[in-house]
């Protein structure tokens, strides 16, 4: 699942991931993401941190309470404290925007194994 409030970024990520054979669901806010997590199972959640109705921290914490899942933070926040906070919230990986798609693909491969 991809959780991103910026429509263009969400569209590009969804197309690229689909092109490389990943099944995806998309959400543009925390509430939508949490509703989707209630009804579907995922291997990985890719989530922005800053969402209009909450945060990616909340999304990954609640998603991990529902199912065994890997989390990838996709964010503009790239300081050491931001990375630490992502890990504490439950993210397994932290990628700073702009995201290197090859790095993201390697992480998805690692997360899926």
Outline where the language-model segments fall.
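Active-site beta3 strand of CheY-like receiver
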Residues: 40-46, 51
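Acidic catalytic/metal-coordinating carboxylates
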Residues: 29-32, 55-58
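Alpha4 helix (beta4-alpha4-beta5 surface) of REC/receiver domains from two-component response regulators
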Residues: 58, 78-94, 106
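Short hydrophobic/Thr-rich beta-strand motif most characteristic of the beta2 strand and flanking loop
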Residues: 21-29, 36-37
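The feature encodes the CheY-like receiver
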Residues: 10, 52, 79
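Two-component/phosphorelay signaling modules centered on CheY-like receiver
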Residues: 7-25
